[in-house]
């Protein structure tokens, strides 16, 4: 394709709010253009990359007998009400109303819709298992879209849904998908690591995320250097081994602590280590207030709270709610309280006595507070995030951290949707049973960004061969010169029989062409310049920067060999 005919609006400067390298490079190289916050158009080069990614995805889905369909993005509220997610999903669900007053959602996911499609069709165990997938735009009303395609309000996904008669069948498909995802990410050029994860709003009993390692990743991966253990930090268990720091029990004392609001400020004020301070936070669980205690150097993990209480309806109490409840602001909270409120404490709070806590009065704290004498803990549990260097739950060693971008996730849903939506089949005994389900997602547009995050240098993108928008970049330095133009035209015709070629025939300066070529990042560059009359051209590899002069008689052989050896 001639570059003069392709819309590639490269930029010299990018908006300052473009933080991620992938966002900056996708804008700068003319692959995407922002419409509004979190919404982008995919321009010709990006569209070609997306087509290459989806071709690989389709191949791997068909390899495991997953069948492609296409469902509507617009979903009626009644389906979401059946599953209970219309009210539970939260503000991220994009809702709208038609002219007749009917409620709809622009789908962030399609569990309800696909269940409604199959529930009156998959009637017998003989029709199972069945796996369906689609590739489609999804929608999520992100509060703060950021990092370009990594956290947008409209995005492209591959989502698959499987239906089974028994758990063994689900296990097999889950494993098939897990392996297919591993192959997909390897083929598209991403270093992705599967990690144990939380199922979030989708639900289910078992799930893995596939994380593309990246410094700008919004998720923290906890992993072992001694085993294959890897988990999202939200899911990583903290091993509790008692390590008591007890001292002689002292009388309870109330002290003035002016302008002290954080655990670290309190530790500094008292001249004590922050891990000897106990923080108190108030949450609402299904509308009921509870207190949660952790030590000063630990942070409460609300995902673990949701898992512990078995509900997604958990939120941190607002400042106004806290003041109305206890008469003090959040920085002054403590468990010594004359109100009926359940108190939950992280396991590691048990290692301390003579606690330092808030007095439920602004400007004051209590010291020498002791469980059993001054207050009672209803239950202890693992309610916090793991720290780097702590022991891992598999016993393999200690926790190490890395950042990652979630590019895919696989879920065992069980009967969460089939039971609520009455999707049943007859088993081999003729009894009605709820369909057992799995769901499996890949962020296609996220994958595009993740590829760029992991495959770039100071000059631009470096596309892996499997997804590159074009195989070769043919550049005529000066098309006004007959010998250069004629040789470039001839090479373009020849190479087009075997490769996808982007032919830079523009009337631009050589520096502009070379800068754009580096920015766009095609794997191999062929430059027709001042030695065209001798039949000599330059061949350059984008990844290594290695270049050599080659006579046109040998050019096809050289290019073919280099291309075959590309990653």
Curated annotation (Swiss-Prot):
GO biological process: prolyl-tRNA aminoacylation
Compartment(s) where it occurs, according to its Swiss-Prot or TrEMBL record: Cytoplasm
Predominant place of localization: cytoplasm
Single GO MF annotation: aminoacyl-tRNA deacylase activity
Assigned GO CC terms: cytosol
Keywords assigned by UniProt, alphabetized: Aminoacyl-tRNA synthetase, ATP-binding, Cytoplasm, Ligase, Nucleotide-binding, Protein biosynthesis
Catalyzed chemical reaction(s): tRNA(Pro) + L-proline + ATP = L-prolyl-tRNA(Pro) + AMP + diphosphate
Top-level division of the source organism's lineage: Bacteria
EC number: 6.1.1.15
Annotated InterPro entries: aa-tRNA-synt_IIb, aa-tRNA-synth_II, aa-tRNA-synth_II/BPL/LPL, Anticodon-bd, Anticodon-bd_dom_sf, Pro-tRNA-ligase_IIa, Pro-tRNA-synth_IIa_bac-type, Pro-tRNA-Synthase_IIa_type1
Family of this protein: Belongs to the class-II aminoacyl-tRNA synthetase family. ProS type 1 subfamily.
Function of the protein: Catalyzes the attachment of proline to tRNA(Pro) in a two-step reaction: proline is first activated by ATP to form Pro-AMP and then transferred to the acceptor end of tRNA(Pro). As ProRS can inadvertently accommodate and process non-cognate amino acids such as alanine and cysteine, to avoid such errors it has two additional distinct editing activities against alanine. One activity is designated as 'pretransfer' editing and involves the tRNA(Pro)-independent hydrolysis of activated Ala-AMP.
Quaternary assembly: Homodimer.
Domain comment in the entry: Consists of three domains: the N-terminal catalytic domain, the editing domain and the C-terminal anticodon-binding domain.
Name of the protein this chain belongs to: Proline--tRNA ligase
């Amino acid at each position: 394709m001639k570059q003069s005919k392709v819309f590639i609006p490269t930029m010299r400067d990018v908006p300052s709010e473009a933080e991620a390298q992938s966002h900056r490079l996708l804008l700068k190289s003319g692959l995407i253009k922002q419409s509004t916050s979190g919404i982008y158009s995919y321009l010709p080069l990006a569209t070609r990359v997306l087509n290459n990614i989806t071709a690989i995805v389709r191949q791997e889905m068909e390899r495991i007998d997953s069948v492609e369909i296409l469902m509507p993005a617009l979903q009626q509220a009644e389906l979401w009400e059946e599953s209970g997610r219309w009210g539970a999903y939260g503000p991220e669900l994009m809702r709208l109303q038609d002219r007749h007053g009917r409620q709809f959602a622009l789908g962030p996911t399609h569990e309800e819709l696909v269940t409604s499609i199959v529930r009156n069709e998959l009637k017998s165990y003989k029709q199972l298992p069945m796996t369906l997938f689609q590739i489609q735009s999804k929608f999520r009303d992100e509060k703060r879209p950021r990092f370009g395609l990594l956290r947008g309000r409209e995005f492209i996904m591959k989502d698959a849904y499987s239906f089974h008669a028994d758990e063994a069948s689900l296990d097999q498909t889950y494993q098939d998908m897990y392996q297919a995802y591993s192959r997909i990410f390897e083929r598209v050029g991403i270093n992705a690591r599967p990690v144990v994860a939380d199922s979030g709003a989708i639900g289910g009993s078992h799930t893995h995320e596939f994380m593309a390692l990246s410094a700008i990743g919004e998720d923290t991966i906890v992993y072992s250097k001694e085993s294959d253990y890897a988990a999202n930090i939200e899911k990583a268990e903290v091993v509790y081994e008692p390590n008591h720091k007890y001292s002689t029990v002292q009388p309870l004392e109330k002290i003035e602590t002016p302008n002290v609001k954080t655990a670290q400020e309190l530790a500094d004020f008292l001249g004590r280590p922050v891990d000897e301070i106990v923080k108190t936070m108030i949450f609402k669980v299904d509308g009921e207030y509870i207190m949660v205690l952790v030590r000063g150097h630990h942070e409460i993990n609300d995902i673990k709270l949701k898992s512990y209480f078995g509900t997604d309806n958990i939120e941190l109490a607002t400042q106004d709610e806290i003041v109305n409840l206890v008469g003090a602001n959040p920085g002054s909270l403590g468990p010594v309280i004359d109100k009926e409120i359940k108190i939950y404490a992280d396991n590691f709070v048990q290692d301390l006595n003579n606690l330092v806590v808030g007095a439920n009065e602004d400007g004051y704290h209590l010291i020498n507070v002791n469980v059993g004498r001054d207050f009672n803990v209803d239950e202890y549990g693992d309610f916090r995030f793991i720290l780097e260097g702590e022991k891992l739950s598999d016993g393999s060693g200690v926790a190490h951290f890395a950042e990652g971008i979630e590019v895919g996730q696989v879920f065992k849903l069980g009967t969460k949707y089939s039971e609520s939506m009455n999707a049943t089949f007859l088993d081999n005994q003729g009894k009605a049973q709820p369909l057992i389900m799995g769901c499996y997602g890949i962020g296609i547009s996220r994958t595009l960004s993740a590829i760029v995050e992991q495959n770039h240098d100071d000059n631009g993108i470096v596309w892996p061969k499997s997804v590159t928008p074009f195989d070769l970049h043919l550049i005529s330095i000066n098309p006004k010169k007959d010998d250069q133009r004629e040789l470039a035209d001839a090479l373009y015709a020849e190479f087009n029989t075997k490769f996808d070629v982007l032919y830079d025939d523009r009337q631009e300066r050589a520096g502009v062409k070379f800068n754009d070529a580096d920015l766009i990042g095609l794997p191999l560059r062929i430059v027709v310049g001042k030695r065209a009359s001798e039949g000599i051209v330059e061949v350059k590899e984008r990844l290594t920067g290695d270049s050599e002069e080659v006579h046109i008689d040998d050019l096809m052989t050289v290019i073919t060999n280099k291309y075959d050896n590309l990653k």
